[in-house]
Amino acid sequence: MIQSRLMLGEGIVEPMLALARCSKQQRIIVAGSNSAQLMFELHRQGYLRVVTTRHSGLPHGQSDVALVDWRGHSIKALETTLDWLVHFLSPTGVLVIWVDPQDRASNRKLCSILETHDLLVEAGTVRERGSAISARRHELNPISRVA
């Protein structure tokens, strides 16, 4: 348990939750090589509606938040993961990805990948050991609201 807390204790959980602006009642799906540890840490903090992609059992479109710990993986490999992960998000869901420190070209590539999945970057944070970015679905044809 201490080992897994050390892996996540590098200050990634709190910034990811802040970017997601999620409540403890929302459904959260976690992905990445440390997804099980991330799920247990979120459970420890009172987020009980958290599942990993491996054990979700949720139909597509049911998750309010997707948290992805992508440290140690390439941005190119993230594209393949997003191909199926975005389908778990609800239409108003938010995706937060934590990546290793990277250069500007890699940041542009990440934004480009998000755009190809119809996600618009909302916010981000840069820390010593990496950065996180949040994105939401892009509505190509917003629905008009009639009062």
Regions found by a protein language model. Name each.
Residues 97-120:
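Conserved class I S-adenosyl-L-methionine
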Residues 1-25:
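Class I SAM-dependent methyltransferase Rossmann-like catalytic core
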Residues 7-11, 29-36:
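Class I SAM-dependent methyltransferase "Motif I" SAM/SAH-binding loop
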Residues 112, 117-147:
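Core SAM-dependent methyltransferase catalytic element
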Residues 30-35, 52-55, 68-73, 98-102:
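Structural motif
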Residues 77-94, 111:
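A short glycine-rich, Lys/Arg-flanked "PGG" loop and its adjoining helix->strand segment in the class I
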Residues 55-76, 80-83:
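A short acidic, Gly/Pro-enriched loop at the edge of an enzyme's catalytic core
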Residues 15-16, 34, 39-61:
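A short, well-structured beta->alpha microelement
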